[in-house]
Amino acid sequence: MERREDVIVGKHVYGSLYGVPREKATDEEYLRGVVVRAAESAGATVHAVNSWTIPGEKGGVSVIVLVLESHLALHTWPEYDYATFDIYTCGEHTDPWKAFELLLSELKPRKYTVHYVDRSQEKTVLEAQPRR
């Protein structure tokens, strides 16, 4: 196997937001804008945005932003004043913590939980050889 010196940088910030105001948690257009701005604040390149409102009394909003460096997602449960978020970015130039800070400043939860996982790979990556 041939060795190659590469660094694959992956940073994953995810968690829950409690006490999100209902008027924010139900506004699909507003939430789309928030997640796009969060992606941009992280230094990520927005590629595609999709969102939808789940109808009904227990409906909510989901927003997915596909970035060239990975993705951001936000899902709300307005009946519980609750939302979850997932911010995964690749590359040294991105900072998912900046996206998280923007979510906090925009959605203004009363409290939150946040987790971080370093999903980077070791510097030495073994390249697969073709089968014979």
From Swiss-Prot:
Site (Cleavage (non-hydrolytic)) residue list: E69, S70
What's its EC?
A: 4.1.1.19
Identify residues that carry Pyruvic acid (Ser).
S70
Q: Which GO terms describe its cellular component?
A: cytosol
Name the InterPro entries for this protein: AdoMetDC_fam_prok, ArgDC, S-AdoMet_deCO2ase_core, S-AdoMet_deCOase_pro-enz
Q: Name one GO biological process term.
A: polyamine biosynthetic process
* Keyword field: Autocatalytic cleavage, Decarboxylase, Lyase, Polyamine biosynthesis, Pyruvate, Schiff base, Zymogen
Q: How is it modified after translation?
A: Is synthesized initially as an inactive proenzyme. Formation of the active enzyme involves a self-maturation process in which the active site pyruvoyl group is generated from an internal serine residue via an autocatalytic post-translational modification. Two non-identical subunits are generated from the proenzyme in this reaction, and the pyruvate is formed at the N-terminus of the alpha chain, which is derived from the carboxyl end of the proenzyme.
Comment on bound cofactor: Binds 1 pyruvoyl group covalently per subunit.
* Biological pathway: Amine and polyamine biosynthesis; agmatine biosynthesis; agmatine from L-arginine: step 1/1
Q: Which cofactors does this gene product need?
A: pyruvate
**Molecular function in Gene Ontology:** arginine decarboxylase activity
Q: Where is the active site?
A: S70 (schiff-base intermediate with substrate), H75 (proton acceptor), C90 (proton donor)
Q: Which reaction does it catalyse?
A: L-arginine + H(+) = agmatine + CO2
Name the top EC class: lyase
Its quaternary organisation is: Heterooctamer of four alpha and four beta chains arranged as a tetramer of alpha/beta heterodimers.
Q: What does this protein do?
A: Specifically catalyzes the decarboxylation of L-arginine to agmatine. Has no S-adenosylmethionine decarboxylase (AdoMetDC) activity.
Family, as annotated? Belongs to the prokaryotic AdoMetDC family. Type 1 subfamily.
Protein name, please? Arginine decarboxylase proenzyme
- Name the source organism: Aeropyrum pernix (strain ATCC 700893 / DSM 11879 / JCM 9820 / NBRC 100138 / K1)
Query: Lineage of the native species?
Result: Archaea, Thermoproteota, Thermoprotei, Desulfurococcales, Desulfurococcaceae
